[in-house]
């Protein structure tokens, strides 16, 4: 299970002052570009990609529809993604599939897609259908993050992940049940078939994230021999 940590600068000065040494034990860097004004994203990009040269980067524009900090039309969203991809070719591009279906056809040739779905309110009854629809598109990663209202919601998310991974062993999944109640799902990726777990450093990017230091300790215990 790979550890993912976010960088969330709000301006170019913050981007230039990122302490990359804090990320040495992280496998993937997620640049949450939605913390910037939309007109600043392209100009701040060089600082991010230079800071983390040689590291695997996920470019994410988390929009307000899915708990993020930026509001964009479908076309603005896809155009920004395509511009960043054309210049920097990040290892992964997050695409909010259900929020921007109307422009998904423009992403069909992208080999680095993380098709994502986030629901900060609930674990929807049609969660299995969401898994199925995104898995059929065979992106590089299927990412699902939902908010549990009960213990059963957490178990459902974990069971669906295990089931779809078993049926689609070549497909990568990154799934999590959010909040304190769902924290167990962030630790059990190796059991259920989720390839990534998202951690916090100075500031969490989603509710229920475990700190990098705690995650390292937990994984050491889980992965150690008897």
UniProtKB/Swiss-Prot annotation:
Coiled coil: none annotated. It comes from the Bacteria. It is an enzyme of class 4 (lyase). Pfam families: DHquinase_I. The active site is at 118 (proton donor/acceptor), 143 (schiff-base intermediate with substrate). It catalyses: 3-dehydroquinate = 3-dehydroshikimate + H2O. 3-dehydroquinate binds at residues 30-32, 62, 186, 205, 209. GO terms for biological process: 3,4-dihydroxybenzoate biosynthetic process; amino acid biosynthetic process; aromatic amino acid family biosynthetic process; chorismate biosynthetic process. Its EC number is 4.2.1.10. One of its GO terms (molecular function) is 3-dehydroquinate dehydratase activity. The keyword Ubl conjugation does not apply. Pathway: Metabolic intermediate biosynthesis; chorismate biosynthesis; chorismate from D-erythrose 4-phosphate and phosphoenolpyruvate: step 3/7. Keywords: Amino-acid biosynthesis, Aromatic amino acid biosynthesis, Lyase, Schiff base. HAMAP family: AroD. Belongs to the type-I 3-dehydroquinase family. Homodimer. Involved in the third step of the chorismate pathway, which leads to the biosynthesis of aromatic amino acids. Catalyzes the cis-dehydration of 3-dehydroquinate (DHQ) and introduces the first double bond of the aromatic ring to yield 3-dehydroshikimate. This is 3-dehydroquinate dehydratase. It comes from Streptococcus equi subsp. zooepidemicus (strain H70).
């Amino acid at each position: 299970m790979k550890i993912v940590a976010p960088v969330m600068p709000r301006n170019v000065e913050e981007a230039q002052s990122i302490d990359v040494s804090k990320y040495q034990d992280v496998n993937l860097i997620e640049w949450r570009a939605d913390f910037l004004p939309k007109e600043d994203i392209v100009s701040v990009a060089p600082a991010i990609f230079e800071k983390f040269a040689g590291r695997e980067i996920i470019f994410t524009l988390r929009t307000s529809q899915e708990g993020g900090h930026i509001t964009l039309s479908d076309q603005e969203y896809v155009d920004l993604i395509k511009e960043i991809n054309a210049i920097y070719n990040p290892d992964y591009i997050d695409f909010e599939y259900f929020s921007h279906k109307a422009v998904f056809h423009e992403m069909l040739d992208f080999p680095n897609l993380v098709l994502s779905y986030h629901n900060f309110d609930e674990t929807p009854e049609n969660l299995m259908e969401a898994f199925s629809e995104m898995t059929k598109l065979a992106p590089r990663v299927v990412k699902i993050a939902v908010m549990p209202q009960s213990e059963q919601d957490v178990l459902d998310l974990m069971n669906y992940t295990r089931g779809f991974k078993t049926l689609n062993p070549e497909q990568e999944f990154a799934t999590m049940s959010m909040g304190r109640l769902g924290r167990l799902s962030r630790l059990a990726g190796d059991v259920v078939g989720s390839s990534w777990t998202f951690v916090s450093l100075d500031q969490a990017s989603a509710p229920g994230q475990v700190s990098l230091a705690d995650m390292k300790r937990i994984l050491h215990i889980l992965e150690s021999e008897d």
